[in-house]
Amino acid sequence: TWFGKTGKTDALLSVIMRKRGNIYQSDGEHAPNKEKPAALFAKGSVGITDSNKAGASLRLYRNNTTEPGNSTQTHGDSGLRDRKTVQNDVQFWYQYAPVDNSLINVKSTLYLSDITIKTNGHNKTAEWRNNRTSGVNVVNRSHTLIFPGAHQLSYGAEYYRQQQKPEGSATLYPEGNIDFTSLYFQDEMTMKSYPVNIIVGSRYDRYKSFNPRAGELKAERLSPRAAISVSPTDWLMMYGSISSAFRAPTMAEMYRDDVHFYRKGKPNYWVPNLNLKPENNITREIGAGIQLDGLLTDNDRLQLKGGYFGTDARNYIATRVDMKRMRSYSYNVSRARIWGWDVQGNYQSDYVDWMLSYNRTESMDASSREWLGSGNPDTLISDISIPVGHRGVYAGWRAELSASATHVKKGDPHQAGYTIHSFSLSYKPVSVKGFEASVTLDNAFNKLAMNGKGVPLSGRTVSLYTRYQW
């Protein structure tokens, strides 16, 4: 990566090349995989005048892989495929922000993304598809003082069009197009006399898709939101929010009818569902955070943050995999409930850096009271870094503990809990600014671990990392 800045001009260039082989999993098997990804990213900007600025970015991505049709299968019986991905992204933007007018800071962005994927499978004709997205986004930000405080206003509009063209035997992504339009407004207010921040806003989305087989689908929604945070002391912050949103079904969710994956040589096919309805939901969140300085030593800091959220969804779009009939399809859950907790803590001092986090997410069909299986069981992650001596050497220990996954879809097997330990050693010399090197041993004891969907996690893995920034 190279970055440079001179006067009113700045630029960045990044090149990434990787090579990856079979994935060693915690059940002792190797998931068949071979890939050679390469990416180039370049961006730059120039200040034309004090009020005018323009920039552009370019991203090129190439990847040649040999992988199974179903990446969740451990054994190579899912049918290996040669897959080539070519992606080109380009973006241009212009910003006008007069220094003597706090009400005007407008930025316009034009973007184009073009992705071509070609796949050749054993005993199968070639698949080819192209996905092109082009759009424009305009947003203005205004700062003003209006009773009872300071306001930061953000308002704008976005439009994009997505086109998909398949050839060969590719029907997973059918021919068609999507037009998406949105208008949005937000006011973030900081009260003058009280330690209170208030955010109110709304967003209007309009979605239209067309497919020669199924015709036209239209959906629109006005989604308001509001949030408030209160800081009664310099060490305590409390917050709450309520927001609504909608999600229209994608073309793939409605029309796909290709092979989803193979198991023991038998294909599991996608079944189209042309009757999918748009999803609407309301999410409520509440939480609090504290920060304490100089708790045990003069230079230490303790940060704690915890929150709870609950989402009520109408026509929730879910996916069902029927292993008995060997078919998969998207469907609407008339009423769904998703909720969860998230707690994070961090203690920093000259002697230790310790991060601790806890998460749990549940999802349920509110009508039948059956689990949807898209949540996460109780998971606790502890990450400790301790300096060794005074020469920039740090020893790390990461432990991930997950409870058993029992709240799964009806008919799906329960997954046992697991504990994974990883160790690391890193070097950040004070005399060489910007240099960092580390070695990490993930899943050090090579424990068998499955996620909630039954996919084996990685087994014992050694990673080497180095970076130098100047």
Where are these regions (language model features)?
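Short loop/turn motifs that connect adjacent beta-strands in outer-membrane beta-barrel proteins
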Residues: 7-8, 50-53, 98-105, 143-152, ...
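Transmembrane beta-strands of outer-membrane beta-barrel pores
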Residues: 6-8, 17-21, 60-64, 112-116, ...
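Signature of Gram-negative outer-membrane beta-barrel scaffolds
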Residues: 150-237, 241-243, 248-250, 259-263, ...
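Flexible loop and strand-edge segments within Gram-negative outer membrane beta-barrel domains
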Residues: 20-22, 26-27, 31-37, 51-106, ...
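Surface-exposed extracellular loop regions of Gram-negative outer-membrane beta-barrel proteins
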Residues: 71-73, 206-210, 216, 230, ...
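Gram-negative outer-membrane beta-barrel transporters
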Residues: 191-198, 298-314, 329-408, 436
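Membrane-embedded beta-barrel scaffold of Gram-negative outer-membrane proteins
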Residues: 4, 9, 105-121, 239, ...
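Predominantly transmembrane beta-strands of Gram-negative outer membrane beta-barrel pores used
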Residues: 1-32, 39-47, 55, 306, ...
